[in-house]
Swiss-Prot record:
It comes from Metamycoplasma hominis (strain ATCC 23114 / DSM 25592 / NBRC 14850 / NCTC 10111 / PG21). HAMAP family: EF_Tu_B. This is Elongation factor Tu. Residues 10-207 form the tr-type G domain. It catalyses: GTP + H2O = GDP + phosphate + H(+). Keywords: Cytoplasm, Elongation factor, GTP-binding, Hydrolase, Magnesium, Metal-binding, Nucleotide-binding, Protein biosynthesis. Monomer. Residues 19-26 are annotated as: G1. Mg(2+) binds at T26.
Length: 397
């Protein structure tokens, strides 16, 4: 079958399904694609094609993820669904699939379960802004008890969302049956369309990366005789015009400079923007004053820090991680953007050790200041291999 041409004039939004194992995340993902396919807005998908998720690597970690795309009348969506619970944890912490919003799937027959809670907490920690809820499997109730049971589960879900800092009072909650919709039952197909209307209106369009303040991590530095020092790297966000000021942040005291040349693939440019691999010529900066691991950023938009709280996933032995637990004062390398910095780890009170496979909250103290902010992603490495992945949740100093 020919691939659909997606209409790029529609705003693009990244979403994903989250929730407890067997509550119907993958069935719902298939149902959304299948129902929208009837309007010519998606390719119909069956459960197996989504469940059989390909392996991906992000920050040295293997993750199984299914990506599907579809449209509504208003938007173009990229939707991520993970087969296993550990895949969700890894995916969200590494930022492999950024989510602008999530659809939380809760089986109305069970109500919220342990992973429901864990996924909501993870969504909060990694900065997913909005959650829409789908109460699944309502076809399992007898007609006369359905309304009451759905109402009870809805109350539980709202209080759980509020507990973790989401807007439990106003989050849209749609009840339905993903399986019945996937099988083509018109009554239940309506529920899927209602869900997508809620996603269209409640989940906000993300700010484009180009609208954010300029930031580029330095990968390499060299000197051009007679012209000066050039720093190269990939622009993470924002736009930089020729002759604008930037700050060199991290590892050393922050310095200001002016970008007097922007080069990409040996061509001179007037600006560099998010996604570009660029070389920036820095006025009055000596080769020794800028190094890999620093960032070039719009002045006063990012500051170097040495201490922060983070949520971290520690790889299992089978994933290439450590074979043994680690304890207080473990001092691995923290890999931010383009460089490793040694840091010490402290646990939350009451925890003695961290075992491979754990998802844990830690306090980290780096030996050198690095340009970081809430939401910055990092890997934890030991002897050059990745043993964990994390996301900064709170800056301490």
């Amino acid at each position: 079958m020919a691939k659909l041409d997606f209409d790029r004039s529609k705003p693009h939004v990244n979403i994903g399904t989250i929730g407890h194992v067997d509550h119907g995340k993958t069935t719902l993902t298939a149902a959304i694609a299948t129902v929208l396919a009837k309007k010519g807005l998606a390719e119909a998908r069956d459960y197996a094609s989504i469940d059989n998720a390909p392996e991906e690597k992000a920050r040295g970690i293997t993750i199984n993820t299914s990506h599907i795309e579809y449209q509504t009348e208003k938007r173009h969506y990229a939707h991520v669904d993970c087969p296993g619970h550990a895949d969700y944890v890894k995916n969200m912490i590494t930022g492999a699939a950024q989510m602008d919003g999530a659809i939380l799937v809760v089986a109305a027959t069970d109500g919220p379960m342990p992973q429901t809670r864990e996924h909501i907490l993870l969504a909060r920690q990694v900065g997913v802004p909005k959650i829409v809820v789908f109460l699944n499997k309502i076809d399992m109730f007898k007609d006369d008890e359905r309304e009451e049971m759905v109402g009870l589960v809805e109350m539980d879900v709202r209080s759980l969302l509020s507990e973790y800092g989401f807007d439990g009072d106003n989050a849209p909650i749609i009840a339905g049956s993903a399986l019945k919709a996937l099988q083509g039952d018109p009554e239940y197909e309506k529920g899927i369309l209602e869900l997508m209307d809620a996603v269209d209106t409640y989940i906000e369009e993300p700010k484009r990366e180009t609208d954010k303040p300029f930031l580029m991590a330095v990968e390499d530095v060299f000197t051009i005789t007679g012209r000066g020092t050039v720093a190269t790297g990939r622009v993470e966000r924002g736009v930089l015009q020729l002759n604008e000021e930037v700050e060199i942040v991290g590892l050393k005291p922050t310095k200001k400079t002016v970008v007097t040349g922007i080069e990409m693939f040996r061509k001179n440019l007037k600006e560099a923007q998010a996604g570009d691999n660029a070389g920036l010529l820095l006025r009055g900066i000596d080769r020794s004053e800028v190094e890999r691991g620093q960032v070039l950023a719009k002045p006063k938009t990012i500051v170097p820090h040495t201490q922060f709280e983070a949520t971290v996933y520690v790889l299992k032995k089978e994933e290439g991680g450590r074979h043994t637990p680690f304890f207080h004062n473990y001092k691995p390398q923290f890999y931010f953007r383009t460089t490793d910095v040694t840091g010490g780890i402290e646990f939350k009170p009451g925890r003695e050790m961290v075992v491979p496979g754990d998802n844990v909250e830690l306090t980290v103290t780096l030996i050198a200041p690095i340009a970081i902010e809430e939401g910055t992603k990092f890997s934890i490495r030991e002897g050059g291999r990745t043993v964990g992945a994390g996301s900064v949740t709170k800056i301490l100093k």
